[in-house]
Regions:
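Long, contiguous binding/interaction regions
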Residues: 1-190
């Protein structure tokens, strides 16, 4: 399946319709604009540092995706002027398996992808991150990925809660000052 044309309906908790769609190269300006409206705390939670803007190189990386090794989804609200980007989720395949595993052993390990999310401040707590995660998990399964990994600051309870309530088997481990989250995709808790 060609995930570069991915598009699915969703809704905020208040019922406002949204779309979860593939990020496209022409989304660069919307990413810049959305970033400019993020609070310092949201930026720090996503990037683990303060930053004022996205560089050209970052925008290129975030919008030119192959949808096999690097998948990006945008949550958008349609309005008369076009679309309002309210959140982004992405997954990047980590080689053939766990980071740091080499050679034949790497080929025998399950495929992992690292995921990251950012949701505009006024839309946090509205289910956007959960929907982005659910759609990324579905795409990852179709691509043969068996685990989603994330690194989260311990103070980012909202994101940790999104993972914990995803319906996926989740393990958390505090390592080097970050919460390492691993979500197993081959089975879903019911």
């Amino acid at each position: 399946m060609d995930f570069s044309t991915y598009d699915a309906p969703g809704a905020l908790r208040d019922g406002t319709p949204i779309r979860i769609r593939a990020i496209r190269p022409e989304d660069g300006e919307a990413l810049r604009e959305g970033f400019a409206h993020l609070s310092e705390q949201t930026i720090y939670h996503r990037f683990f540092q303060s930053k004022r803007e996205l560089t050209e190189r970052e925008v290129e990386y975030l919008t030119h995706l192959d949808f096999e090794h690097h998948v990006g989804l945008a949550a958008v609200i349609s309005n008369p002027a076009g679309e309002l980007l309210i959140g982004v989720g992405r997954g990047v395949r980590l080689g053939g398996g766990r980071p740091g595993v080499r050679g034949a052993e790497r080929d025998r390990t399950p495929a992992h992808a690292e995921v990251a999310f950012v949701v505009g401040d006024e839309f946090q707590g509205q289910g956007v991150g959960s929907q982005l995660l659910a759609h990324l998990a579905g795409i990852a399964r179709a691509l043969g990925i068996r685990y989603l990994d994330a690194e989260v600051l311990p103070g980012n309870r909202q994101m940790i809660d999104v993972f914990a309530h995803s319906g996926l088997p989740v393990t958390e481990q505090l390592r080097d000052g970050l919460v390492h989250v691993e979500m197993r995709l081959e089975e879903v808790a019911r």
